[in-house]
Curated annotation (Swiss-Prot):
Gene3D superfamilies from the UniProt entry: Anticodon-binding domain (3.40.50.800), Bira Bifunctional Protein, Domain 2 (3.30.930.10)
Gene Ontology MF terms: ATP binding; proline-tRNA ligase activity
GO cellular component terms, A-Z: mitochondrial matrix; mitochondrion
Chain segment of the transit peptide: 1-29
Locations listed in the record: Mitochondrion matrix
Similarity section: Belongs to the class-II aminoacyl-tRNA synthetase family.
CDD domains hit by this protein: ProRS_anticodon_short (cd00861), ProRS_core_prok (cd00779)
Superkingdom of origin organism: Eukaryota
SUPFAM superfamilies referenced in this protein's UniProt entry, alphabetically: Class II aaRS ABD-related (SSF52954), Class II aaRS and biotin synthetases (SSF55681)
Organism: Rattus norvegicus (Rat)
Function, in words: Mitochondrial aminoacyl-tRNA synthetase that catalyzes the specific attachment of the proline amino acid (aa) to the homologous transfer RNA (tRNA), further participating in protein synthesis. The reaction occurs in a two steps: proline is first activated by ATP to form Pro-AMP and then transferred to the acceptor end of tRNA(Pro).
The gene coding this protein: Pars2
One GO BP annotation of this record: prolyl-tRNA aminoacylation
Identification of the protein by name: Probable proline--tRNA ligase, mitochondrial
Length: 475
């Protein structure tokens, strides 16, 4: 028995030692300071880079030049990687930006009463045949059959599915209206010529909202409500936008507007009135007139990227699927509908397109994957003595400013010069880059702080850095 107890004590001691050793390994691997949280470091980020143009073209499956700034920059810094024509892998930085954009969208949609749902991407052919869009959509619709021969499509939009869903609720009351249902999911479209990276792909993320109202007047009020939410969204992102009258296209309805970001590579042609701010897609305007229909002033032409689209549908879909509600008098009436889309990945790429320089990505501040990058001195340099000071700064920032936890990266690639790491940070567009250069050895230490969105460079003490970062807003 005594021998057994001795062996148990030995095993316990070995286990404790092993556990301590593993903790040391983890701490070293993740750059953890004793008693501190895990530090996020650049060296551990999965970020394929430096693809040659011929590699990119081979991955995309077509021989054409990279003709779009956002596409070129996102490929160069490893934000996206082509999987097949029109389909991209989104790398960790990009996923973080998309998630932040979705949070902003959620805030705006839920502020007006939106309820988030999730509908299947596979949509039965009979729903689309009921509206005639199985044939109307033509080759853009990605179609498939299951093992039983049943036909489906990968939904580019969900008017049929959501109307059938609401119609299945036989006791829908006027008291539940307006009903605003939305989702953020992957959509699919068999683009004949996918190009411009995330701006025109075959698979993309989209926010689509569908509204159900008790009357035409109420539906148009809801239409205005959602449009106003879109305006606030783009204002929060710091983007210059236009709300342009547009064609209803294959979705149908009686009224439609596009939200456009003016930019030269845009594929949509728009006319704008400088006097009354009327704007419209040229698809619905007689260009030979060149006169504003609202104020009779002259129209100018520009190009834009469509990032949002709204439709007043009336009873186009509710009449087909019998989506009724019961009014205050017990009568069964057709719901008046609207649908509203936001291209999530397209907004991200379009924002990079309009905000970035030719060489460096610039994000809407709310969407930057990480808000701060801290660059310690190069190993073996004269400033290397400041390494501990800058690591302590990282810990102090993330502990004292809770909103920045998970938002600060430490560029631990100390085999590289500060200049090389600053160049990488500029390309990736962190809103703030903090460098431990020569003045970090002063008493008190001063850090070189780059504000990427303003171009300002200042030297601040730790207290100054903390005060500056206190004002950073994170979603």
């Amino acid at each position: 028995m005594e021998g057994l107890l001795t062996r148990c004590r030995t095993l316990s001691a070995l286990a404790t030692c092993s556990l301590r050793h593993s903790r040391c390994i983890v701490r070293k691997c993740y750059h953890c300071a004793p008693g501190r949280g895990q530090r996020l470091v650049v060296s551990r980020m999965f970020q394929p880079q430096n693809l040659r143009e011929d590699q990119v073209l081979s991955l995309e499956g077509r021989a054409s030049d990279l003709t779009c700034k956002s596409q070129r920059l996102m490929l160069q810094v490893g934000l996206i990687l082509p999987a097949s024509p029109g389909c991209y892998h989104l790398m960790p930085y990009t996923v973080r930006a998309v998630e932040k954009l979705v949070r902003v969208i959620d805030q705006e949609m839920q502020a007006i009463g939106g309820q988030k749902i999730n509908m299947p991407s596979l949509s039965p052919a009979e729903l689309w045949r009921a509206t005639g869009r199985w044939d109307l959509m033509g080759r853009e619709l990605l179609r498939l059959k299951d093992r039983h021969g049943k036909e489906y499509c990968l939904g580019p939009t969900h008017e049929e599915a959501v109307t059938a869903l609401v119609a299945s609720q036989k006791k829908l009351s006027y008291k539940q209206l307006p009903l605003l249902l939305y989702q953020v999911t992957r959509k699919f479209r068999d683009e004949p010529r996918p190009r411009f990276g995330l701006l025109r792909g075959r698979e993309f993320y989209m926010k689509d909202m569908y509204t159900f109202d008790s009357s035409s007047e109420a539906a148009q009020e809801t239409y205005s409500l959602v449009c106003d939410a879109y305006c606030r969204l783009f204002d929060r992102l710091g983007l210059r936008w236009m709300k342009a009258r547009a064609d209803v296209g294959s979705i149908g309805g009686t009224m439609s507007h596009e939200f456009q970001l003016p930019v030269d590579i845009g594929e949509d042609r728009l006319v704008v009135c400088p006097s009354c701010h009327f704007s419209a897609n040229t698809e619905i305007v007689d260009l030979s007139q060149k006169i504003c229909p609202d104020c009779q002033g002259p129209l100018t032409e520009t190009k834009g990227i469509e990032v949002g689209h709204t439709f007043y549908l009336g009873t186009k879909y509710s009449s087909i699927f019998n989506a009724h509600f019961t009014n205050a008098h017990g009568e069964s009436l057709l719901a008046e509908m609207g649908c509203y889309g936001l291209g999530v990945t397209r907004i991200l790429a379009a924002a990079i397109e309009v905000l970035s320089t030719e060489d460096c990505i610039r994000w809407p501040s709310l969407l930057a994957p990480y808000q701060v990058c801290i660059i310690p001195p190069k190993k073996g340099s004269k400033e290397a003595a400041a390494t501990e000071i800058v690591e302590r700064l990282y810990d102090d920032v993330t502990e004292a400013l809770p909103q920045l936890r998970g938002e600060v990266l430490l560029d631990d690639r100390t085999h590289l010069t500060i200049g090389n790491r600053l160049k990488d940070a500029n390309k990736l567009g962190y809103p703030f880059v903090i460098i431990a250069s020569k003045r970090a050895l002063e008493d008190p230490a001063h850090f070189e702080v780059w504000s990427q969105n303003t171009g300002e460079v200042v030297f601040l003490t730790k207290e100054g850095v903390m005060e500056l970062l206190t004002g950073v807003h994170v979603v």
